[in-house]
Amino acid sequence: MMMMGEGVSSVPPWSHLPVSGVDVLGGGGGGGDEMTPYVIAALRDYLPANDVGVGADEEEEAAAMAAAVDAYACDEFRMYEFKVRRCARGRSHDWTECPFAHPGEKARRRDPRKYHYSGTACPDFRKGGCKRGDACEYAHGVFECWLHPARYRTQPCKDGTACRRRVCFFAHTPDQLRVLPAQQSSPRSVASSPLAESYDGSPLRRQAFESYLTKTIMSSSPTSTLMSPPKSPPSESPPLSPDGAAAIRRGSWPGVGSPVNDVLASFRQLRLNKVKSSPSGGWSYPSSSAVYGSPKAATGLYSLPTTPLASTATVTTASSFMPNLEPLDLGLIGDEEPVQRVESGRALREKVFERLSRDGAISGDATAFATAGVGLDVDWVSDLIN
């Protein structure tokens, strides 16, 4: 207790300077600097700069959204699910940003796997409405037209990679360009040609295409029997003149009587019967143009063999081609004499000439000549014509 009359002692003011040897953060002296890193590490849990976990969550959410966008942007989803599948979201949202279909939406599409319609725009739908509805075979609206599997990304986009459309129907890179599978060709379009590819349906173009196709098919077969020799095609230079062809069709020649025609008809029928009864007989087409220069072929007659070794008989018809009768292969017959093949129609010839003798059409010498059994030569017919 201070006594009265004593002097007043002055108290110095409080110094704000740190005391030497004392650490403010450590709260004590002597080695306080060693505790500083631990204190800072403890305070880092409360610093606002530590947002590593929050950033990871945002990155995962962004990756999930990107995956969803990629799934919505793939070709399969665009062609078969975009504006086809019903939207399952219950709350109100922007339909233009939603890839799914909504009730009453104009962009709604029919499922191309369920409804078989083409990618061609429906003309009635453009005018205001189509009465056929979902049963229509054409596309209703822009989305059905350009998102159809037959048209989606089959053409390149004019903007390329700089395109900023939310939904683009075209390809931006060569990898995105879709190549449709090759269509099955019809039997009529076997031969590929520029004319066949550019056919537009006009009658003149179709006629030219069929003509081209016929020539291509016939010329591609080296053994085709329908092709005429190149030097003298039947359509350009027929072996027979019109008068000669008409005479053959009428079955008569000027200046020759009817009995001669009967003889020739009998010979022709006899030769045909032999060919039909032979196992190696048949019709064939000429393999060369040598028969076109035959003087006997121009008369329209069968050239009967004058010897047993004759191989071929030719005939010229009114249709401008000359078939060959297959020869009777006498070499394959071992025991049969060739003369017997020539004389097989002797009885028929005797009956024919007996009839001609009664009619007085031929002389008695010719009758004796036929009775003798010698092989007949029809070269005398040319003398009668001349």
UniProtKB/Swiss-Prot annotation:
It comes from the Eukaryota. Residues 180-200, 220-252 are annotated as: Disordered. One of its GO terms (cellular component) is nucleus. The keyword Mitochondrion does not apply. Its main location: nucleus. Keywords: DNA-binding, Jasmonic acid signaling pathway, Metal-binding, Nucleus, Repeat, Zinc, Zinc-finger. SMART domains: ZnF_C3H1. Residues 220-229 have a biased composition (Low complexity). InterPro entries: Unkempt-like, Znf_CCCH. It is found in: Nucleus. Pfam families: zf-CCCH, zf-CCCH_AtC3H23. GO terms for molecular function: DNA binding; zinc ion binding. Residues 182-192 have a biased composition (Polar residues). Involved in leaf senescence delay. May repress jasmonic acid (JA) signaling role in promoting leaf senescence. May regulate panicle development and pollination/fertilization process. This is Zinc finger CCCH domain-containing protein 2. The lineage of its organism: Eukaryota, Viridiplantae, Streptophyta, Embryophyta, Tracheophyta.
